[in-house]
Amino acid sequence: TDTLITKKIYNKKPSCISQWYSVNVGYKDEGLIPIPLGIANEYEKNLSENEITQNAVSKEDKLYLNFRENTSYKHRHKLYDYFSNFDWSISRNPDLDNNDYSTDLSRYKFVLCPWGNGVDTHRIWETLYSGSVPVTKQHLTLSTLKDIPVVFYENYKEITYKELTYNT
């Protein structure tokens, strides 16, 4: 679901449900377990064992931006303008076909993964499969990612080339 599971929503669960597994968890409770959103169905067609192996090659030390603003205007609208001012970031058209998008994910070391319809996004998981490092805003629903290579931030203005390369 794209809906954030809040305390209010969680408290409406029927008593016959002892454990609730969900994406986009926004409330902490023993009976509410966050699970990953995973990759988008259309992206899976481009994913092969060979592609994953090729992703181990050297990557450009840049922050890659490729996302639609309309899926979460509040979290995304300023990001393209802000990061286009830096030589360590690169922006691409969000209408790339899946092959070109997959190639780009594999090419760059860091990928900006702003929240979309939900907090967890397919882009986070596609980035991990491509062997690159997702960069996303910190949230409870993403707490299960703390032991894998993900760069978290509180405010996008905290993201600097030095911070990215220091944290990975």
PLM region descriptions:
Residues 155-157:
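Short helix-start
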Residues 1-152, 163-168:
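Nucleotide-sugar donor-binding catalytic core of glycosyltransferases
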